[in-house]
């Protein structure tokens, strides 16, 4: 009986330390965001983070202006600087307003006959805090399609991530965080933001 109690206490002690070790590791690691691929990316991305218009053009769009923003992190939870972030989405009418990269796609999901200035795509580079943001519009929602945007993040030292962002109430956030253009925040204080912190597989040169 004494031998049994001794073995039980010994194994219980090992289990405590094992759990403690796992908990400690979690403080220095983030869950990697899973890939969700989309076939409707544009053949050519607009080189701006404003999806509402082409650079140098006036904006004329039909829908609700929003911000899509967040941070890019590596698996050690370190902010990733100078990551290329690509975003593409459908407009308020449910169609993508550009020529698709892939040819074997449902052509009914695209249009080039709209008088809207909405481009549906954009690119931005993360700052030294790993932050990014896009000016966009709330996409179409129906019984078949959720309100989503598609995003891809590329960095030379990390695994490329492509996933889908769900623009739902649970992902809404305040406008008082991060580095957003003062002109935008002053003139559009009521604009709704959706925040997404995304984690890429791999590590940068430093660890928090």
Swiss-Prot record:
Record keyword Oxidoreductase present: yes
GO molecular function, one term: oxidoreductase activity, acting on single donors with incorporation of molecular oxygen, incorporation of two atoms of oxygen
Keywords: Dioxygenase, Oxidoreductase
Enzyme category, top tier: oxidoreductase
Record keyword Oxidoreductase present: yes
EC number: 1.13.11.-
InterPro entries tied to this protein: Intradiol_dOase_C, Intradiol_dOase_core, Intradiol_RC_Dioxygenase
UniProt record similarity statement: Belongs to the intradiol ring-cleavage dioxygenase family.
Protein name: Putative dioxygenase RT0384
